Amino acid sequence: DAGASGRARVNLNRFDLAMLKPFMPEATQASGVFTGNADVSWDTTKEGLPQGKVTLSGRNVKVTQVVNDAPLPVAFDTLNLSADLHNNRAELGWLIRLTNNGQLDGQVQVTDPQGRRNLSGNVNISNFSLAMINPIFARGEKAEGRLNARLRLGGNVKSPQLFGQMQLSGVDIDGNFMPFDMQPSQLAMNFNGTRSTLQGTVNTRQGQIAL
């Protein structure tokens, strides 16, 4: 019995992802080590949710997923995750740096999780290379280009809103599934609440397609 009120602290020391192998599908492999800690307090005699914070940090983490009978490896230089619940606000944060690739970072807040559940926060993608997915393509097919995004969250959990821009620069996808021979192109997706617009120019050997 945890009692009507109390506090718990837990440390996670060198949790090896190999221990999860029996619970993973055959097409997924994971390696690396996680460390972290959790600090949670509760008081059932008062209204509201428990208070607490959880942090996780990965080291030498690598995930390989088999897609179309080909392995797609993803290695992480940095993999930090955090979750916090204090003062009637829940927050999730992340910082992910891919080996020889870009960075993903951001945070999402939910204010009044038991009531209005208002959303705020941001999602950032920096210099992410599409070439990472080339291992799953057939011979002669490829993807190139860089993805960058600066996005902001709004609205609430029931009706989320997204603001900002996502850009693809130098994007060039060659494959039998493409209806034309694509050349390096520029694309941008602009988000304004519940609406979005696609802009840019797709270059082909036959000319340009303006969006």
Regions found by a protein language model. Give the residues of each.
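Interface amphipathic segments
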Residues: D1-R152, V157-L211
